[in-house]
């Protein structure tokens, strides 16, 4: 087992990474607050891992809520169901919420924990690659709104993250590839050596070769933990974690939540960010080619869907958390391994990037 620490003073917590962790009862037990546990999971994950988790929680008063699966269910209405179940039991403010699932479950369960009785403890047990390397770490919790993705939420840190790599054995190929998009992101924004490693070993990660998979998860989590420790609430450097996300969120919202997986949209968004970075003179054609080649080898989209026309794309991008005083800011690449947040681009260059990306 590997442990990565997220250093946030009194709110610091560990990320546990390894095989068979769901069966190690003591790992979760030392982070559970109180004697009441609500497990939030979904219809896909529950038949696979809920019983295993509950076997380790026999000393607690447990309940579970099983939600429908998919980004389209990450809504205020479904969040209400979590609150309803917490209140019907009822659970006190000395309970612990456990999120068992991918990014959607983690985001919603975390947001519910942040709000319920003004905040209760929660634990992340991510079961997808994307959740293990990104969404479970850092305390971002949210639901979507029809006008924008993740626009209603809170920063609220978990007590721990338990990333059992065995859960990736049941992850379908599309979800695995989508998770690899967020792994690639870390190499692009701040870790060129990792990017180079991925160019050589992405096929091993996709083949679920254990040592490659664990290395990719650990390296990703260490990168994110360092960024979160430096800027928990995204007032500075943490914003670089959004490489590809402004474009990607526009794709997700424009197509309808769930049509593309989050990682697929981010992959297309990173390709667009690389293109705009080249137009600004920051990346060479060769460097952009390296980005596109890795995305292609990962089986990820490199273009935006033609269903979203340019005017609509720009309209959707304007509903973004990085917009300040009506000014759109984007995460772009000064070079491979170095990202910046900037509004220093002309609208005609942005429109040219959108035109080129749309297929």
UniProtKB/Swiss-Prot annotation:
One of its GO terms (molecular function) is 3-dehydroquinate synthase activity. One of its GO terms (cellular component) is cytoplasm. Pathway: Metabolic intermediate biosynthesis; chorismate biosynthesis; chorismate from D-erythrose 4-phosphate and phosphoenolpyruvate: step 2/7. It is an enzyme of class 4 (lyase). CDD domains: DHQS. Its EC number is 4.2.3.4. One of its GO terms (biological process) is aromatic amino acid family biosynthetic process. InterPro entries: Dehydroquinate_synthase (IPR050071), DHQ_synth_AroB (IPR016037), DHQ_synth_fam (IPR030963), DHQS/DOIS_N (IPR030960), DHQS_C (IPR056179). This is 3-dehydroquinate synthase. The lineage of its organism: Bacteria, Pseudomonadati, Pseudomonadota, Gammaproteobacteria, Chromatiales.
């Amino acid at each position: 087992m590997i442990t990565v620490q997220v250093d946030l003073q009194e709110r610091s917590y560990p990320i546990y990474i390894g095989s068979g962790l769901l069966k190690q009862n003591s790992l979760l037990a030392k982070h559970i607050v109180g004697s009441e546990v609500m497990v939030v999971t979904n219809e896909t994950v529950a038949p696979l891992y809920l019983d295993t988790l509950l076997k380790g929680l026999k000393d607690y008063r447990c309940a579970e809520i099983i939600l429908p699966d998919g980004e389209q269910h990450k809504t205020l209405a479904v969040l209400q169901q979590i609150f309803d179940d917490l209140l019907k039991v009822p659970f006190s403010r000395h309970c612990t919420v456990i999120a068992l699932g991918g990014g959607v479950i983690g985001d919603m369960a975390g947001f519910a924990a942040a709000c319920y009785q003004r905040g209760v403890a929660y634990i992340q047990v991510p079961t997808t690659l994307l959740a293990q390397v990104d969404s479970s770490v850092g305390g971002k919790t949210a639901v979507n709104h029809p006008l924008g993705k993740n626009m209603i939420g809170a920063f609220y840190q978990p007590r721990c993250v338990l990333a059992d790599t065995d859960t990736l054995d049941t992850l379908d190929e599309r979800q695995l590839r989508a998770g690899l998009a967020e792994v690639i992101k870390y190499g692009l924004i701040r870790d060129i050596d990792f990017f180079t490693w991925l160019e050589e070993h992405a096929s091993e990660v996709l083949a679920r070769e254990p040592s490659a998979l664990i290395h990719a998860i650990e390296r990703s989590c260490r990168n994110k933990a360092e960024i979160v420790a430096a800027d928990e609430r995204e007032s500075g450097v943490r914003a670089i974690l959004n490489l590809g996300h402004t474009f990607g969120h526009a794709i997700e919202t424009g197509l309808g939540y769930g049509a593309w997986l989050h990682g697929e949209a981010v992959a297309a968004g990173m390709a667009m960010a690389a293109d705009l970075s080249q137009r600004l003179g920051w990346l060479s054609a060769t460097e952009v080619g390296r980005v596109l080649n890795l995305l292609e080898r990962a089986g990820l989209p490199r273009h935006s869907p033609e269903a979203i026309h340019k005017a609509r794309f720009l309209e959707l991008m304007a509903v973004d958390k990085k917009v300040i005083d009506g000014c759109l800011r984007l995460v772009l690449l000064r070079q491979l391994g170095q990202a910046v947040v900037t509004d220093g681009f002309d609208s005609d260059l942005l429109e040219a990037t959108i035109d080129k990306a749309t297929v």
